[in-house]
A protein has these predicted regions:
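Thiol-/selenol-based redox modules, centered on thioredoxin-like
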Residues: 118-149
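Short pre-active-site segment immediately N-terminal to redox-active cysteine/selenocysteine motifs
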Residues: 34-36, 40-44, 110
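Conserved redox-active cysteine motifs that mediate thiol-disulfide chemistry
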Residues: 40-57
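Hydrophobic beta-strand core positions in alpha/beta domains
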Residues: 39, 69-71, 115-116
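Short, internal strand/loop/helix patches
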Residues: 82-120
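A short beta-strand-turn-helix
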Residues: 18-36, 59
């Protein structure tokens, strides 16, 4: 049951979380059949400065194969997130959850924390933190899921 809960909550939380464009958070139908990497981040998070270039690279390299990266910002002040994004542009979907609905539901205790979700909507892994040495392992996990079908 919990395996599909993350995607469902991402959709249900759309009333309190907005995409960077101001549109509702997500369209569940658009995620069907995709491998989804959900990353919780904040402007004050030092490792997030390292993860954003990696996520840009992964989205660019594997997006056409079915990877969707969604970065969920938890800053209380939208301006803090905007300042971070000016310094570290995102070429993937960014949503804002200043009320912390999603991190609370998933027990996120630190930033960044990521979840890797397979094409069937099941959470396959959870990863706390981000170090440059994590890149290869995370990329391999994503590639395995992309080629599982």
């Amino acid at each position: 049951m919990r395996t599909r809960v993350l995607l469902l909550l991402l959709v249900l939380a759309s009333h309190s979380a907005l995409a960077a464009s101001g549109d509702p958070l997500l369209d569940l139908a658009a995620l069907k059949g995709q491998v989804v990497y959900v990353d919780f981040w904040a402007s004050w998070c030092a490792p997030c400065r390292e993860s954003f270039p990696w996520m840009n690279h992964m989205q660019e390299e594997l997006g056409r194969d079915g990877l969707v990266i969604i970065a969920v910002n938890v800053d209380h002040e939208h301006s803090d997130a905007e300042h971070f994004l000016r310094e570290h542009p995102a070429r993937f979907r960014v949503v804002f959850d200043p009320d912390g609905v999603l991190p609370e539901k998933f027990g996120v205790r630190g930033m960044p924390t990521s979840f890797l979700i397979d094409r069937d909507g099941r959470v396959q892994s959870r990863h706390a933190g981000f170090r440059l040495t994590d890149r290869d392992s995370l990329a391999q996990q994503i590639r395995v899921l992309l080629h599982a079908h």
